[in-house]
Amino acid sequence: MAKKRGKKYQDALKKVDSKKEYAVDDAVDLVKEIDFANFDATVEVAFNLNVDTKQADQQLRGAIVLPNGTGKDQTVIVFAKGENAKAAQEAGADFVGDQDLVEKIQDGWLDFDVAIATPDMMPQVGRLGRVLGPKGLMPNPKTGTVTMDVAKAVSDAKAGQVTYRTDRDGNVAVPFGKVSFDTAKLVENLKTIEDVVVKARPAAVRGTYIKHASIASTFGPSVTLDLTTF
């Protein structure tokens, strides 16, 4: 049985026309208006794409640096040695190490948001796949987190980089800021994400690519977007 939503959610839902597709600016304004969380809630966009995720070339994955950040301070760790470790520290990484950092995570430590590694560290980091993989923390070249340019990777992560990937049903969900952000900043972040998703369209896709898009705050109801207003 589906869980019944509370009164605050129901009151918020009454303000949303479920049959309407809202212009991007209006949708952001509405999500901000109907948010009822007692904290600065995250705002997320969800796209449903016309892709066949059984085909490797139609599985989208990547990273986006949002122009206005996410509103969240990211704890960043880097697996690196020597000069690369020094570069990571100078770029502002919170924790830098090699085998010692691997062992720390094997012992159960997971107090971080982004993990970055140099390619030479991946044989050791690969042992953490069962721990980091399910949490979306495993370094990956597609998201720019397996790289020799650790300084840039750290800077991007600290600046508000978000990652995206399709689930098996072709959905992509990406956070793009906080309810407290100005509408203009949320809209700019949202349009940046939409632009990246559109450019990542697989060549094999025919017909409509983005079938549906909506935004919502952490606990709030979703608001459907008019895709022609991006």
Curated annotation (Swiss-Prot):
The record's Gene Ontology cellular component field reads: large ribosomal subunit
Q: Which domain of life is it from?
A: Bacteria
The record's listing under InterPro entries reads: Ribosom_uL1_bac-type (IPR005878), Ribosomal_uL1 (IPR002143), Ribosomal_uL1-like (IPR023674), Ribosomal_uL1/biogenesis (IPR028364), Ribosomal_uL1_3-a/b-sand (IPR016095), Ribosomal_uL1_CS (IPR023673)
Keyword RNA-binding appears in the UniProt entry: yes
GO MF term list = rRNA binding; structural constituent of ribosome; tRNA binding
Q: In the record, which residues are listed under signal peptide?
A: none
Indicate whether RNA-binding appears among the record's keywords.
yes
Which CDD domains does the entry mention?
Ribosomal_L1 (cd00403)
Q: PROSITE patterns this protein is in?
A: RIBOSOMAL_L1
Keywords, A to Z, come to: Repressor, Ribonucleoprotein, Ribosomal protein, RNA-binding, rRNA-binding, Translation regulation, tRNA-binding
Q: Which SUPFAM superfamilies match?
A: Ribosomal protein L1 (SSF56808)
- List cystine links: none
Please list the GO biological process terms of this entry: regulation of translation; translation
Q: Which family does the entry's similarity section mention?
A: Belongs to the universal ribosomal protein uL1 family.
Q: How does it assemble?
A: Part of the 50S ribosomal subunit.
Q: What does this protein do?
A: Binds directly to 23S rRNA. The L1 stalk is quite mobile in the ribosome, and is involved in E site tRNA release. Protein L1 is also a translational repressor protein, it controls the translation of the L11 operon by binding to its mRNA.
Q: What is this protein called?
A: Large ribosomal subunit protein uL1
Gene name of the encoded protein: rplA
